[in-house]
Amino acid sequence: MATSLGSNTYNRQNWEDADFPILCQTCLGENPYIRMTKEKYGKECKICARPFTVFRWCPGVRMRFKKTEVCQTCSKLKNVCQTCLLDLEYGLPIQVRDAGASLKDEMPRSDVNKEYYTQNMEREIANSDGTRPVGALGKATSSSDMLLKLARTTPYYKRNRPHICSFWVKGECKRGEECPYRHEKPTDPDDPLADQNIKDRYYGINDPVADKLLKRASTMPRLDPPEDKSITTLYVGGLGDTISESELRNHFYQFGEIRTITVVQRQQCAFIQFATRQAAEMAAEKSFNKLIVNGRRLNVKWGRSQAARGKERERDGSSDPGMKLEPVPGLPGALPPPPTEEESSANYFNLPPNGSAALVNISLPPPPGLSGPPPGYGPHMFPPMAPPPFLRAPGHIHYPSQDPQRMGAHAGKPSSG
């Protein structure tokens, strides 16, 4: 059997020989100094079944060794990593990327058609500059909002952890801490994420990870335009102290003519009124959950008309500005007004200005040595004491310190005999 590359018996002219793999940051690892082994024609691609150069490396400490799974041609056709088959730009599965970009997979599945298609794509890749994807992905216009919201911008290195030790699950692992595999409980076998196929991920069908992300995208909040067509005002919140009116105008002028921009610095918000409803809808669609000015993410909502605010107040029962609330139990009553300057010099107890002097009867126990009163008589009573001339009859006592009966102790004179 001929084994030279020039033999067309097994189409060896199309075998791949590469110098460096196409990897994402997560699969490459956080260590910038890694050793990578290279094996020419070490395995066949799991998509096109052609031999290709296999690279193998360890992405970090206590991580499992990883290797390339598909050839670089299949990787460039889908713009994916050779190991995890996730999109290199967004870090998402191919099914999610194609759904967000409205792409349809037109790759053939049969062996002969797949080989012919791959050769044509290789010719197209060779004629391009190599910086942009080819095929249907290269013809895509722009990224959608869903892809920007679901995009994974930071590497997730936990994906490189070792697999679970099957001996530990059975209780037979004797390596202990030296075991290179994880000693953890495995996931539920009924979990859809436990069954993943590399071909299904590449072709974008029956991918459980993609289904999970698409369900999350369907529950994301959306900014629907109000039914009232007269509303052309947008609310922009979270301005802070650094964003000015000119910076808002520089961003929103691209959507249409701006009538007014009102910045409420105290509330750190602004109201932008457009001349047409179409311009306001376009600004709301392009800016909702995506507006960043001076490194600050701003909140964009639709403004509300005065009629709508009045209806909401009537619905909530708060239309009357003088709404009366129920008094809180346990609070003291209203305090009297403060005294005038003339009265405050002598009236220390907030007594009323007019009225007769009150007589204060003080009942004290008899001094020691005196017997109690006879039966049928009350306790010893002392003559009433008149208050000082500057004190007047006490009115309503508001505080205990205003009670003249509590000002010191009053001792009676002992009776002789």
From Swiss-Prot:
Provide the disulphide bond pattern: none
Gene Ontology biological process terms from the UniProt entry? mRNA cis splicing, via spliceosome; positive regulation of RNA splicing
The record's Gene Ontology cellular component field reads: cytoplasm; nucleus; spliceosomal complex
Q: Which UniProt keywords apply?
A: Cytoplasm, Developmental protein, Metal-binding, mRNA processing, mRNA splicing, Nucleus, RNA-binding, Spliceosome, Zinc, Zinc-finger
Which GO MF terms does the UniProt record name? Answer: pre-mRNA binding; U6 snRNA binding; zinc ion binding
| Record's compositionally biased regions (Pro residues) | 364-391
- Domain text from the record? The C-terminal RRM domain and the zinc finger motif are necessary for RNA-binding.
Name of the molecule in the record: Pre-mRNA-splicing factor RBM22
Q: What is the protein's species of origin?
A: Xenopus tropicalis (Western clawed frog)
Upper classification of the source organism reads: Eukaryota, Metazoa, Chordata, Craniata, Vertebrata
